[in-house]
């Protein structure tokens, strides 16, 4: 059985291109693997705590190897609980719209809450940083309204801080096996939008069949 975690990052729901492509992937994957267990984290309905002084005190106490007070223990336990679905998953699917050339603030908030030493990575002077989510696969469905090709006014090397950031974060926490699904030009008219979504959905279905053939 594959445990699939879908992190949903768009509030647009039925109108979301990233969510549409992620659903195409998940549906096709489940057709190949009917026993797949799917868990969804909708970041817009999830109660994300603030990374406040107590949580930061807990973080630095952990780094220093110092005991945590009661309030710090509660704050740290909440961060661990938020990260637990990532540890449990075999396959991580993220549906990510591009906002102002980067990722939605809800996703950045989530990443900041769970990306800590002892939760998603380890650190020691001899081995440096080691991601704790090894032997997992990630599929990211990226949606962009504009054209990010090299000939456009927003070429990806200069304007795309969405995909490179997610790839770096996934590598940092130990997920080297990554796949990208990209749908662009979604605000350039209904015909272009529909064609872009259709092409990305076909790529998603093909990738799902490819990954479903593997054993987890």
From Swiss-Prot:
Keywords: Flavoprotein, FMN, NAD, Oxidoreductase. FMN binds at residues 10, 16-18. GO terms for molecular function: electron transfer activity; FMN binding; oxidoreductase activity, acting on NAD(P)H as acceptor; oxidoreductase activity, acting on NAD(P)H, quinone or similar compound as acceptor. Its EC number is 1.6.5.-, 1.7.1.17. Binds 1 FMN per subunit. It is an enzyme of class 1 (oxidoreductase). Its cofactor is FMN. It catalyses: 2 a quinone + NADH + H(+) = 2 a 1,4-benzosemiquinone + NAD(+); N,N-dimethyl-1,4-phenylenediamine + anthranilate + 2 NAD(+) = 2-(4-dimethylaminophenyl)diazenylbenzoate + 2 NADH + 2 H(+). It comes from the Bacteria. InterPro entries: Flavodoxin_fold (IPR003680), Flavoprotein-like_sf (IPR029039), FMN-dep_NADH:Q_OxRdtase_AzoR1 (IPR050104), NADH:quinone_OxRdtase_FMN_depd (IPR023048). Gene3D superfamilies: 3.40.50.360. Belongs to the azoreductase type 1 family. Quinone reductase that provides resistance to thiol-specific stress caused by electrophilic quinones. Also exhibits azoreductase activity. Catalyzes the reductive cleavage of the azo bond in aromatic azo compounds to the corresponding amines. Homodimer. This is FMN-dependent NADH:quinone oxidoreductase 3.
């Amino acid at each position: 059985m594959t445990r699939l975690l879908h992190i949903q990052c768009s509030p647009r729901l039925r109108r979301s291109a990233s969510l549409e492509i992620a659903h195409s992937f998940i549906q096709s994957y489940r057709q190949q693997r009917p026993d797949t267990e799917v868990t969804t984290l909708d970041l817009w309905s999830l109660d994300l705590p603030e990374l406040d002084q107590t949580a930061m005190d807990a973080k630095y106490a952990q780094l220093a190897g110092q005991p945590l007070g009661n309030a710090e223990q509660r704050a740290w336990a909440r961060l661990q609980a938020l990260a637990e679905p990532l540890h449990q998953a075999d396959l991580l699917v993220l549906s990510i719209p591009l906002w102002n050339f980067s990722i939605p603030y809800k996703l950045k908030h989530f990443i900041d809450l769970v990306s800590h030493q002892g939760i998603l990575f380890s650190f020691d002077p001899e081995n440096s940083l080691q991601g704790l989510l090894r032997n997992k696969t990630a599929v990211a469905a990226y949606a962009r309204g504009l054209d990010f090709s090299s000939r456009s006014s927003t070429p990806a090397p200069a304007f795309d801080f969405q995909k490179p950031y997610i790839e770096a974060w996934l590598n940092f926490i130990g997920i080297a096996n990554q796949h990208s699904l990209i749908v662009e030009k979604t605000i350039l008219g209904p015909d272009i939008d529909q064609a872009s979504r259709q092409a990305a959905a076909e790529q998603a279905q093909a990738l799902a069949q490819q990954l479903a053939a593997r054993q987890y």
